[in-house]
Amino acid sequence: MGYGWGIFEGMLVIGSLCLLGSAGLWFLNRRLYKEYEEKRALVQIIFSVVFAFSCNLLQLVLFEIIPVLSREARMVNWKVDLFCLIVLLVFMLPYYHCYLMLRNTGVRRERAAVGALLFLTAFLYAFWRMGIHFPMPSDKGFFSMPQLVSRIGVIGVTLMAVLSGFGAVNLPYSYISLFIREIEESEIKSLERQLMQSMETCIAKKKKILLCQVEVERSLVSEEHQKGKSFFRRFVGTVVRSVQDDQKEQDIKLMEAEVEGLEELSKQLFLEIYELRQAKDAAAFSRTWKGHVQNFLGYACSIYCVYKMLKSLQSVVFKEAGTKDPVTMMISIFLQFFDIGVDAALLSQYISLLFIGMLIVISVRGFLTNLMKFFFAVSRVGSGSSSNVVLFLSEIMGMYFLSSILLIRKSLRNEYRGIITDVLGGDIQFDFYHRWFDAIFVASAFLSLLLLSAHYTSRQIDKHPID
């Protein structure tokens, strides 16, 4: 019976990893890549594997609350998952990312491999030096699990705090109808006319460039036919044609520069029209019943975000440990005043399960949303390979989800923390990561507040920056 149950647990773990890997592959190809030209098989495999191991960490947190697997199976799953994820994040991804970048620049395989190895050595040295400035587990080797997890946690928690701080300000700004500007159709039509005029001018310039290039080619052909004429005529013809060709080449370069400027202007106009269309749709949506509900949720989120910012600021200034989540605290107060005949400990356990589940879902959804925004922004601005961007995002994704375990652990009841503490390392300074998160969160939130305030003010003063 025990042997059969062990096989069942192993198949369940492998099946869940395969399912998560397939979901990561689907997300990469359907939501990130879309129409991008380069789809390296190894890059897709690495992304899906990192996605599977990262989401499996959050799945294991739920398994601690809902005993789907035995304690031994969960312990093995935790250790294998952390080991594989750390090997990918600290060793494989930095090496292969550097190797691929060197290969894309035309470096030969042997030199690219040596260059990637040197980069990995420098990366490991910088990774080790980072531990000097932060509290790390004592009496442990650099390549031990607690040391590596602690260093990854610093980077990942910083990333989470920056995203959370921006989200705490941007979420109310996006949801509350107070910040939604009414857009007139005439404003959009005016920009569309400018866009059409810019595109028509760009097309006309490109036609002129082609005609000039054809004339230059014709002059070269006519020069070949002039070889049979006298030396004086050939000399005069060559001088005249060289002057004309130089003038035409200068005209071509000038028109090409104008075309680049027009294309950039067209791109900015298109983005402005797209943003205005979105703002117009948002204004129309805000007048529906769903919009009113979203507006109410926006105010509720604003209150919670202000509460979170104040509590984080209190934690940073007075160095106080974080208190209970406000939702759990309100339910505890409710149970004290109203006896509904439910065991408080049992209800607290279910609330804990629901709260952790919501944390996990919001964490995954929020990260994937920011992942898509970052990918599209980098792919639109830069000319680098999309594979390099995906490898970079794989590194960030693994660090993000691993660090989320360090923070979620504090929200668990004491009986659910045992395995997580043992696997990550009992001497990891868990409280430090919460204080570090609060400090970066406050800085990110206030900086985002200043930027969004400046953006809102400038938008009110000047409605059309590209007119």
From Swiss-Prot:
Abscisic acid receptor. The GDP-bound form exhibits greater abscisic acid binding than the GTP-bound form. Required for seedling growth and fertility. GO terms for molecular function: GTP binding. This is GPCR-type G protein 2. GO terms for cellular component: endoplasmic reticulum membrane; Golgi membrane; plasma membrane. Expressed in cotyledons, leaves, stems, roots, flowers and guard cells. It is found in: Cell membrane; Golgi apparatus membrane; Endoplasmic reticulum membrane. Interacts with GPA1. It comes from the Eukaryota. Its main location: membrane. Disruption phenotype: No visible phenotype; due to the redundancy with GTG1. The double mutants gtg1 and gtg2 are hyposensitive to abscisic acid. GTP binds at residues 381-410. It is a multi-pass membrane protein. Keywords: Cell membrane, Coiled coil, Endoplasmic reticulum, Golgi apparatus, GTP-binding, Membrane, Nucleotide-binding, Receptor, Transmembrane, Transmembrane helix. The gene is GTG2. Has both a topology similar to GPCRs and a GTP-binding/GTPase activity. Signal peptide: none annotated. The keyword Magnesium does not apply. InterPro entries: ABA_GPCR_dom, Golgi_pH-regulator_cons_dom, GPHR/GTG. The chain crosses the membrane at residues 7-27, 45-65, 82-102, 112-132, 152-172, 296-318, 322-342, 344-364, 388-408, 436-456. Belongs to the Golgi pH regulator (TC 1.A.38) family. Induction: Not induced by abscisic acid, cold, salt or drought treatments. Residues 243-276 form a coiled coil. The GTPase activity is Mg(2+) dependent and is strongly inhibited by the interaction with GPA1.
